[in-house]
């Protein structure tokens, strides 16, 4: 039996250990942040509860019926994300919404490995540290972690792996990594379409078969998008439509997060880009994440579908750069676009010294000082942007995330609702009540055939807009003909049980 080549093993270890360490550091920081959020009772929206109900259903091999969205609501008719079924076994082992937060942190951290590894090949270990941490702690990834779990976290490592494969001209691997995006969210089929066009353009010198392959892949992306939004989503949506239209007036856009969703006319192209001004800030931060020069890479075109539906929409939160989860898909695209440009800058010098593009050696070749200085200069831009914007990003608030003094009272309210019960609640304990229970949100439960057995209210929840409420009277008023009695009241948490 032939022994492994020690030199080959050493090269593999050298190319992997530092990117892995960077990813682990980023992941540990994000997990620490998520746990701190959890202990501080921070609830940005109802979304974590929604996804917890969906994944809980998957863990039981059931359709993702999510009562939080409404009685009998199939979440596959909201956004199309069947890939979340893969999280069912994990949730079955660890049935908690906190599990989803940790899974998201791990997926984001995993995306750091290919990006940092490519940076290491191009710029050495210093480049891996610089690009790896600037990417891993990037604006959109921090925003996703701060906004808590969403389906797009699955897209982040896929985009990172696909982007690195594009830079290295491994077209088959690039297409394989990106194909599952059509199962993550419906609009990502358009991102796959743009990837096909980018592959076609970059591979045009390889002959007609390469061009046809790229065009076929682009066709796959556009067909997947059309089939999803025209057939699959309407078939599973209770209203028989695609729930998220550009004007924000469709059935799915309004969530208890704040922000206007009023329908309006589609604005002019100039207004789409510049009004309100926060759009310009988002574009600036995105370009900085690509070192500005990354915008010249054909890979950067993958940001266009996401920016198009966001900027053309009328929901205020679509435009922001500092706190929205859908920015996450832009960050790996920008990082890989930057590395693509750096790779092209340094490629002639590497070729001159006989360097192989796919070498596992972490030591960079020795191009001219000017090219290398330019590469380092643009590689520093994302880190500089991160430093400038850090105080506006979620991790800056980490020192303030201390355990809520009402945690014991919150746990008491949870314990008052037995497993197997149906319960209606506001946002504060929404996700925490999901394991083993049928959970409804107070804003979507009006069409229930049978009122919930329990009502749980946090009088301090933003869901009430400062109004004075209690579980007993609210439950009786919301469900005429039925009465509730208070069985738990402590530190603003109220639990009422249905008595008739």
What residue ranges belong to the model's regions?
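Specific aromatic-rich, kink-prone transmembrane helix
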Residues: 114, 134, 153-177
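Extracytosolic helix-loop segments that constitute the early lumenal/periplasmic catalytic or substrate-binding loops
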Residues: 32, 50-74, 82-83
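Perimembrane helix-loop-helix junctions
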Residues: 191-221
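Transmembrane-helix motifs of polytopic, lipid-linked glycan transferases
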Residues: 98-122
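Hydrophobic, aromatic-rich transmembrane alpha-helices
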Residues: 274-307
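Hydrophobic/aromatic-rich transmembrane helices and adjacent perimembrane loops
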Residues: 301-365
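Signature aromatic-anchored transmembrane alpha helix within multi-pass, membrane-resident enzymes
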Residues: 20-24, 126, 218-222, 345-391
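Start-transfer (signal-anchor) and selected internal transmembrane alpha helices
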Residues: 1-32, 171, 213-217
């Amino acid at each position: 039996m032939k022994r492994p080549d020690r030199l080959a093993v050493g090269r593999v270890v050298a190319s992997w250990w530092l990117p892995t360490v960077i990813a682990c550091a980023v992941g540990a920081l994000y997990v620490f942040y998520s746990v701190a959020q959890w202990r501080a009772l921070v609830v940005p929206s109802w979304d974590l509860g929604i996804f917890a109900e969906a994944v809980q259903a998957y863990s039981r091999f059931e359709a993702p019926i999510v009562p939080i969205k409404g009685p009998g609501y199939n979440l596959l008719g909201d956004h199309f994300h069947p890939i979340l079924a893969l999280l069912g076994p994990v949730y079955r082992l660890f049935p908690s919404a906190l599990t989803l937060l940790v899974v998201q942190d791990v997926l984001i951290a995993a995306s750091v490995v290919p990006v940092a590894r490519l940076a290491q090949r191009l710029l050495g270990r210093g480049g891996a540290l610089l690009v790896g941490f600037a990417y891993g702690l990037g604006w959109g990834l921090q925003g996703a972690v701060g906004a808590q779990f969403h389906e797009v976290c699955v897209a982040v490592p896929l985009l990172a792996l696909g982007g690195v494969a594009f830079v290295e001209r491994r077209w088959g691997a690039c297409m394989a990594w990106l194909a599952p995006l059509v199962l993550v969210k419906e609009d990502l089929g358009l991102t796959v379409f743009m990837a096909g066009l980018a592959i076609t353009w970059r591979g045009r010198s390889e002959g007609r078969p390469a061009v046809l392959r790229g065009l076929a892949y682009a066709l796959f992306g556009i067909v997947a998008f059309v089939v999803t939004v025209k057939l699959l989503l309407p078939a599973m949506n209770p209203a028989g439509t695609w729930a998220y239209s550009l004007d924000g007036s469709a059935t799915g856009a309004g969530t208890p997060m704040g922000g206007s969703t009023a329908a309006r006319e589609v604005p002019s192209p100039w207004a789409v880009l510049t009004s309100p001004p926060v759009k310009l800030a988002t574009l600036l931060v995105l370009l900085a994440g690509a070192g500005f020069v990354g915008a010249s890479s054909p890979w950067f075109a993958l940001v266009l579908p996401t920016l198009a539906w966001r900027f053309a929409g009328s929901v205020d939160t679509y435009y922001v750069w500092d706190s929205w989860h859908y920015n996450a898909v832009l960050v790996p695209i920008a990082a890989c676009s930057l590395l693509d440009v750096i790779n092209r800058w340094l490629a002639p010098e590497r070729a001159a010294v006989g360097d192989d593009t796919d070498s596992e050696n972490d030591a960079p070749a020795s191009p001219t000082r000017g090219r290398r200085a330019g590469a380092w200069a643009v590689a520093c831009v994302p880190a500089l942007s991160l430093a400038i914007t850090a105080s506006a990003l979620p991790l800056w608030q980490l020192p303030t995330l201390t355990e809520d003094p009402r945690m014991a009272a919150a746990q008491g309210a949870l314990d008052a609702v037995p497993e197997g019960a149906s319960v209606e609640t506001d946002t504060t304990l929404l996700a925490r009540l999901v394991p083993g229970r049928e959970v409804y949100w107070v804003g979507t439960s009006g069409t229930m055939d049978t009122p919930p057995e329990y009502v749980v209210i946090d009088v301090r929840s933003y869901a009430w807009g400062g109004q004075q409420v209690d579980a007993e009277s609210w439950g009786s008023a919301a469900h005429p003909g039925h009465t509730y009695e208070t069985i738990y009241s402590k530190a603003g948490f109220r639990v009422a049980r249905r008595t008739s």
